[in-house]
Amino acid sequence: MRYRTLSGLKEKRKVPRIEVRWPVTIITEKGSVDGEAGNISVEGAFIMFAHSIENLSLSKTYRLLINTAEAKIVVMGKLVWSKLDILPGKGFCFVEITEGDRALLRKAIQKYSKK
């Protein structure tokens, strides 16, 4: 699906994301970083932070622990972009997820999108 965003850029995502407020912990080599998923799909997420996070590197893959109301889901996410000028947030593309966690994530997204 391609459509224009408010900024006028073409959307590249194939699967639309839904707006959420789910806690996320990112595991790094130096410890963990807590954030919040602002939007998510089964293919990726935008994660917001209370302050600027400098110790995450573009194109690097991190372990993400996503806490929905129903489940804790583990995915490996590649950091594909960083937006620090408006809101401390980063975009992740999911590169590895078990079938079980993918099913849990899909179920949580479907349930949350009906609210």
Q: What are these model-predicted stretches?
A:
Residues 65-85:
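Mid-chain, well-packed structural core segment of small domains
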Residues 22-27, 58-72:
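Short conserved beta-strand and strand-loop elements enriched in small hydrophobics
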Residues 45-51, 61-64:
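Short, well-ordered beta-strand segments in soluble/periplasmic domains
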Residues 46-49, 85-95:
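Short, solvent-exposed secondary-structure boundary/capping segments
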Residues 99-108:
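A short macromolecule-binding patch
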Residues 39, 79-83, 96:
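A residue-level detector for short acidic-glycine micro-motifs
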